[in-house]
């Protein structure tokens, strides 16, 4: 095959890859989230949000898969709130919980404010993270492509926006697994300044490759 034909072949493959990215819904969600994180970074440099001051309640946004009648997800967040209240005290906290359907979480998460997060979550996170002092990502399956990339993109978005504005950015008890290349790059790009407290050693090892700072080692029985 001539050099010209090889170059044409490579160009055609590149064009096909770009076209695939353009029509891949997961990729579009990731690209738009990444763009808003970069926009938040620029906004913060030009007009930083007021930082936390001693004596103020710490305003934390808890982002997870809440409001779908997924008992495990709801119980996780309920337990996190209990722990935070125990450690910090109610008078030192102002917690907000993202919920997909407020009607399904009515009566949950005592002392926390519930915020409806739309299915197209990008702008909501862009606006809401700015009004808090930090983000706690609560989803157990935090960085995985097993079912769909959208939920993991939401976790990256919440953490990445907080990190871009020099806020608290913590993934609490998260798990990482097999990720599509585009999701892995998104995690690598936007979660390098976040602290992810992994659920197990396997997740720590996976997150170490894209350079996400590890939290304390998970405890093992015995």
Q: What are the roles of these predicted feature ranges?
A:
Residues 162-218:
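Active-site-proximal region of nucleotide-activated glycan assembly enzymes
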Residues 3-179, 189, 220-222:
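Aromatic- and Gly/Pro-rich donor/ligand-binding loops
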